[in-house]
Swiss-Prot record:
InterPro entries: Aldolase_TIM, DapA, DapA-like, Schiff_base-form_aldolases_AS. Keywords: Amino-acid biosynthesis, Cytoplasm, Diaminopimelate biosynthesis, Lyase, Lysine biosynthesis, Schiff base. This is 4-hydroxy-tetrahydrodipicolinate synthase. The gene is dapA. It comes from Methylibium petroleiphilum (strain ATCC BAA-1232 / LMG 22953 / PM1). The active site is at 135 (proton donor/acceptor), 163 (schiff-base intermediate with substrate). It catalyses: L-aspartate 4-semialdehyde + pyruvate = (2S,4S)-4-hydroxy-2,3,4,5-tetrahydrodipicolinate + H2O + H(+). Homotetramer; dimer of dimers.
Length: 293
């Protein structure tokens, strides 16, 4: 696989009011992202409501995304689970339908040790011949993948990168410095992504890109080229948006924002509920400040 670099949208999963997946809107969002410069489409991750989509829906979303993208940009398929067997099954399907790589989150709830994490990810990489991007987000999973474990996994054939969503720039710097050639470090935290990329990171798996794909692409281009002045200008313009898209748990605010922009409906599946009325003006103002309304 050619290394994926740049703005990777952590795409929402559009839904109808009855909770069914809105595939026409998914296709329209993909077309919009590609037209706006998004470098890679990431589906069925946290922002894509992976915890509440059924296994058959999970697979169908990957299939539809790959089919509709049709090779225009890479597709990163969320295939993580807290069961190694389930993650392998999802990865096999992602490979079967032509995804470019899978995103594999640290197993959540069952709190594996560092050795358990190593064995989990190594088993996936050995079982399915599709590139694996690790995903460390201890704020959601509780278990934290330590840098030593990341570097150990970076030696496993087929494991090609890490989405580092702790927001810890010191940790990210050490990983960038010590990771082997060909192992990519991506930000998974919009507010600190510019710093990670200016320091040698390879891109950003972004929530903000859902509503500002062109700006996030341009931010990634500038930061990875070392153009700190331009990168800072774009970042500062988007800073209120980065903050307010997390005023309630993701993807609640970003789905409301997309609905407000007329891009897709804002329906969510329980236990997620619509954005609080008191916060709607705040999110709307951040969209206006970013020139998106």
């Amino acid at each position: 696989m050619k290394p994926i670099v740049g703005s990777i949208v952590a795409l929402v999963t559009p839904m109808h009011e009855d909770g069914s997946v809105d595939y026409p809107s998914l296709r329209r969002l993909i077309d919009w992202h590609i037209a706006e410069g998004t470098d890679c489409i990431g589906v069925v991750g946290t922002t894509g409501e992976s915890p509440t989509v059924a296994p058959e829906e999970h697979c169908e979303i990957i299939r539809v995304a790959v089919e509709h993208v049709a090779g225009r940009v890479p597709v990163m398929a969320g295939a993580g689970a807290n069961s190694t067997r389930e993650a392998i099954e999802l990865s096999r399907y992602a490979k079967q339908v032509g995804a470019d790589c899978t995103l594999q989150v640290v197993p959540y709830y069952n709190k594996p040790t560092q050795e358990g994490q190593y064995q989990h990810f190594r088993s996936i990489a050995e079982a399915v011949d599709i590139p694996v991007v690790l995903y460390n987000v201890p704020g959601r999973t509780v278990a934290d993948m330590l840098p030593e474990t990341v570097l150990r996994l970076a030696q496993v054939p087929g494991i090609v990168g890490l989405k580092e969503a702790t927001g810890n720039i010191e940790r990210a710097c050490w990983l960038i410095k010590q990771a082997p050639k060909g192992f990519s470090i991506y930000s998974g935290d919009d507010p600190t992504a510019v710093a990670l990329m200016l320091l040698g990171g390879h891109g950003n798996v972004s929530v903000t890109a859902n509503v500002a794909p062109r700006a996030m692409h341009e931010l990634c281009v500038a930061a990875m080229a070392g153009d700190a002045k331009r990168a800072a200008k774009i970042h500062l313009a988007l800073l209120p948006l980065h903050k307010q898209l997390f005023c309630e748990p993701n993807p609640i605010p970003v789905k409301w924002a997309l609905q407000r922009m007329g891009r897709c409906g804002g329906a969510l599946r329980l236990p997620l509920t619509p954005l609080s009325a008191a916060l709607q003006p705040v999110v709307e103002q951040s969209l206006r400040d970013a020139g998106l309304l």
